[in-house]
Regions:
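Flexible, low-complexity junctional segments that flank or bridge functional domains
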Residues: 1-170, 174-190, 194-203, 232, ...
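BRCT (BRCA1 C-terminal) domain core and associated BRCT-interaction motifs
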Residues: 261-299
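Gly/Ser/Thr-rich loop/hinge elements
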Residues: 179-232, 271, 275, 286-288, ...
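Short, well-structured beta-strand/strand-turn elements
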Residues: 170, 242, 256-269
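Acidic, metal-coordinating catalytic cores used for nucleic-acid/nucleotide bond scission
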Residues: 176-182, 240-242, 266-268
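Low-complexity, Gly/Ser/Thr/Pro-rich intrinsically disordered linker/tail segments
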Residues: 299-324
Length: 324
């Protein structure tokens, strides 16, 4: 998209830099000196600079966030996307799981008759929530939730936890779950709690100043159910665990019976004068130990998935072995 005729390139750049300075919540944690960065880039902005070059200049700031929630989007006049600058969650990290291997060797209907399946729509794509028992163990329960961008009814949650309540342990597999509704992920976490749990606090950016923040403590109440599961749990994570999935991990992290295994998890909108759209994270999570979660949560036990072995999921196998 070409900037509006009356819009100066420097005005667009300075507007975006000011929005970041006044609204973005984690500049200090990310080590971004927005004033220095804006000054150094701003000196290279010219009025005759093409739109794509100007976009790339703004994207330098965007990419410094290391934040998949805060993209910059350039659009055509028709409204179609032209350029998107956002953080690549997977850059520098190995693959965390392979869905084909998972289905062929562990969860497929033909080999896992003791796994129940709930087909749910995820924005036009059908996904399956799995729960029950894998063929590898009749006593260790397995729950697979590939997305929180879905609706799981309370009655369905009760069915899941009724099915597994007599298991000796549980594997909760959320690898590749890019998030969705934090209310759903929090509700699922509450099924693993025996008492109200302080999980940390959310820090909200409430003003333009560098220190204009307000903290909101987070306490999660156990699910009102007779089927809560308080036996040992392993949560399988990878870099694709983002947004509401990190919220799930954040809420389960204080629970002493929970172990995280696999890889590190992944962690207000409007537009600038020429129509490019922005999104900026206006809050950050800090866990019960004071750790910032925007860069993700490290597993208790790191396990690297070997994508060259088409018959084995090393992460899932390690979880089964750990819980035996």
């Amino acid at each position: 998209m070409k900037p509006n005729a009356e819009t100066d390139n420097k005005v667009v750049f300075e507007e975006y830099a000011t929005l970041v300075k006044e609204k973005y919540a984690t500049l200090e944690f990310k080590g971004v000196d927005i004033n220095h960065l804006a000054d150094s880039i701003g000196n290279t902005i010219t009025q005759d600079m093409p739109a794509d070059m100007l976009f790339n200049k703004l994207a330098i700031i965007t990419n410094r966030f290391r934040d998949g929630h805060s993209p910059l989007i350039g659009v055509y006049a028709s409204g179609n996307f032209e350029n998107i600058a956002t953080f690549d969650l997977y850059a520098g990290y190995p693959v965390g799981f392979n869905d084909t291997i998972l289905q062929n060797s562990y969860t497929g209907a033909s080999i896992a008759p003791n796994l129940k399946r709930i087909a749910i729509d995820d924005q036009g794509t059908s996904v399956e929530v799995l729960y029950g028992f894998l063929p590898q163990s009749a006593t260790i329960a397995y729950i697979r939730i590939p997305s929180f961008n879905v609706t799981i009814e309370d009655s369905q949650l009760e069915s899941i936890f009724t099915k597994i309540k007599n298991a000796t342990a549980c594997i909760l597999d959320v690898r590749g779950n890019g998030g969705g509704a934090p209310s759903l992920s929090t509700k699922i976490a509450s099924y693993f709690m025996s008492q109200t749990t302080y999980t940390g606090f959310e820090r909200f950016k409430i003003g333009p100043g560098a220190n204009d923040f307000q903290d909101g403590p987070s306490n999660v109440t156990p699910a009102n159910s007779d089927n809560r599961f308080t036996q040992p749990v392993v949560v399988l994570t990878d870099r694709g665990c983002y947004s509401a999935t990190t919220t799930l991990c954040y809420n389960m992290n204080p629970l002493t019976q929970v172990t995280f295994m696999g890889q590190r998890t992944g962690g207000g909108s409007g537009s600038v004068a020429n129509g490019w759209q922005w999104s900026l994270s206006t809050s950050e999570f800090i866990d019960h130990l004071g750790n910032h979660l925007d860069d993700g949560i490290n597993p208790d036990i790191q396990v690297i998935f070997d994508n060259t072995d088409q018959n084995q999921d090393e992460v899932l196998d390690e979880a089964l072995l750990y819980l035996q």
